[in-house]
Amino acid sequence: MNILDIISGILGDDVKLGYLPDTPDEITAVFEYSAEQPFHSFGNTDFTENIQVRTRGKNSYTKAKETALTLDNYTDENISIIQTTPVFDIGRDSHERQEYTVNFKVYRR
């Protein structure tokens, strides 16, 4: 399963995957970016992937913090997630809507 689909299952269906549409004003999107080489050990291969959560709108800081609390230290039988950056203010978009990002490392077994 694609890592973005897995994250959507954790965060919910209202999260956009891989793109940030112009509407609605209040939105959360998740992006995948360059990953590390697989780690091979005896009888096992672990994959590390990186994701970025980007929030936009009047409540974007609160939403980014809530998302960070949900994902940081999340673990199940297939993945473990750790937060790798603080919630970061990236400014306003071309429509003056506030945006924040937060990044995570996802370990897949």
What are these regions (language model features)?
Residues 59-66, 82-86:
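Short C-terminal domain-edge/linker segments immediately following a structured domain
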Residues 73-109:
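Acidic-leaning, charged glycine-interspersed low-complexity segments
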Residues 40-41, 45, 83-86:
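Compositionally biased, intrinsically disordered low-complexity segments enriched in polar/Pro/Gly
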Residues 1-43, 62-69, 74:
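Small/polar-rich, solvent-exposed N-terminal microdomains that initiate assembly or binding
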Residues 22-24, 46, 95-97:
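A generic structural signal for short, non-catalytic loop/turn and secondary-structure boundary residues
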Residues 7, 15, 30, 53, ...:
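Hydrophobic beta-strand residues in large extracellular and virion-surface proteins
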Residues 45-59, 98-108:
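Oligomerization/assembly interface segments of phage tail-like spikes and tubes
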